[in-house]
């Protein structure tokens, strides 16, 4: 049985960095960033990669079927039983589709959804300060922030009703944030 942990948060919340730290701390945990999985496809310079690149460059969401197929392929190919995926879901449609897919995946259990919560001001400061790529400018930031904010209440409610939603303060030191996220994951590992 694979145990899946989703880490969500605004652009610049630190979710990818946090998840990477946890995977380094725990040998039994694998980490995939939705963005990295999609950027890897772009790097292949395939037709699909070119399509994804155009969408990402505008700060928009990649079509649902592409993201779901990318995620489920990564989970099935993973040799580890505890998997963190950050940056997913980003819309109600993505959440609903993942729920449908997981209902038919008897070897994958969604163990927790963890939101790294930061204010828009902190998110903007972090994103514009990191200059990771062409998608890190003010106009694209506001578009990405809008894409994040619009569905977040419904996403929180959905996973809260399932009893698997956790929100942590992402405006602290990375050590404090990682400790909190790791505690949630380790608890699930120990429970089996």
Curated annotation (Swiss-Prot):
Pfam families cross-referenced by the UniProt entry: ADK
Keyword Repressor attributed: no
Residue numbers spanned by region LID: 129-135
Entry EC number(s): 2.7.4.3
Residue segments, region NMP: 33-62
Annotated pathway: Purine metabolism; AMP biosynthesis via salvage pathway; AMP from ADP: step 1/1
SUPFAM superfamilies hit by this protein: P-loop containing nucleoside triphosphate hydrolases
PROSITE patterns on file: ADENYLATE_KINASE
Molecular function terms, GO-annotated: adenylate kinase activity; ATP binding
Binding site for AMP: 34, 39, 60-62, 87-90, 94, 132, 144
Subcellular location: Cytoplasm
One GO term of the biological process aspect: AMP salvage
Catalytic activity entry: AMP + ATP = 2 ADP
UniProt domain comment: Consists of three domains, a large central CORE domain and two small peripheral domains, NMPbind and LID, which undergo movements during catalysis. The LID domain closes over the site of phosphoryl transfer upon ATP binding. Assembling and dissambling the active center during each catalytic cycle provides an effective means to prevent ATP hydrolysis.
Subunit details: Monomer.
NCBIfam families noted in UniProt: PRK00279.2-2
Family, as annotated: Belongs to the adenylate kinase family.
General function of this protein: Catalyzes the reversible transfer of the terminal phosphate group between ATP and AMP. Plays an important role in cellular energy homeostasis and in adenine nucleotide metabolism.
Protein name (record): Adenylate kinase
Originating species: Campylobacter hominis (strain ATCC BAA-381 / DSM 21671 / CCUG 45161 / LMG 19568 / NCTC 13146 / CH001A)
């Amino acid at each position: 049985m694979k145990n899946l942990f989703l880490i969500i948060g605004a652009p610049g919340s630190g979710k990818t960095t946090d998840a990477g730290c946890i995977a380094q701390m725990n040998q039994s945990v694998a980490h995939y960033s939705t963005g990295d999985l999609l950027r890897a496809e772009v790097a292949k310079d395939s037709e699909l990669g070119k399509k994804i690149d155009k969408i990402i460059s505008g700060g928009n969401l990649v079509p649902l079927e592409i993201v779901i197929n990318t995620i489920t392929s990564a989970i099935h190919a993973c040799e580890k039983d505890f998997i963190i995926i950050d940056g997913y879901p980003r819309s109600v449609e993505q959440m609903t589709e993942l729920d449908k897919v997981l209902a038919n995946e008897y070897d994958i259990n969604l163990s927790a959804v963890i939101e790294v919560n930061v204010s828009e001001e902190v998110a903007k400061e972090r994103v514009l300060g990191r200059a990771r790529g062409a998608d890190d400018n003010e106009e694209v930031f506001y578009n990405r922030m809008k894409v994040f904010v619009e569905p977040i209440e419904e996403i929180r409610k959905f996973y809260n009703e399932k009893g698997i939603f956790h929100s942590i303060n992402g405006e602290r030191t990375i050590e404090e944030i990682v400790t909190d996220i790791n505690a949630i994951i380790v608890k699930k590992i120990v429970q089996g």
